[in-house]
């Protein structure tokens, strides 16, 4: 498993801490083998250099795990939402397909992944549009309210991670979050 360059020493510690917390929060809803299969998907995605740090330098696996903790702990969502969140980058970058995810984890997980990918594609095209049409389009694209809740949790996580960042991109992200939040 050659993921050493992908995670800093600090991130490795954080990764194990988040893993334990997430397992504690969702362990009873996970099916046998979910964690092992998820790890295999993530390692494969990392080893194939399919995901990279974002504009803030945040590690996408750590960011998704932090968001998954918010989803589980603060919103109360369980297996399908957590797995969908953790696997959506692997599907988006082509390491695996939504059909494979559906066969391994079920339609519920695959549906959340499809929703996250669709909403993220829409959102990346126009993240700060304030119109009522965009709000309606976003909700229509999501099809599943869990997708919107996961996106809100993701924005909350990003806001927490970049609170001390002074650059313009951080401010744009903050504005983007407020618009998404206002749409709810």
Where are these regions (language model features)?
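Conserved small/polar residues in nucleotide/adenosyl-binding loops
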Residues: 178-184
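Hydrophobic or amphipathic alpha-helical targeting/insertion segments
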Residues: 89, 100-115
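Histidine/acidic-rich helix-loop-helix segments that form or flank divalent-metal centers
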Residues: 108-152, 163-173
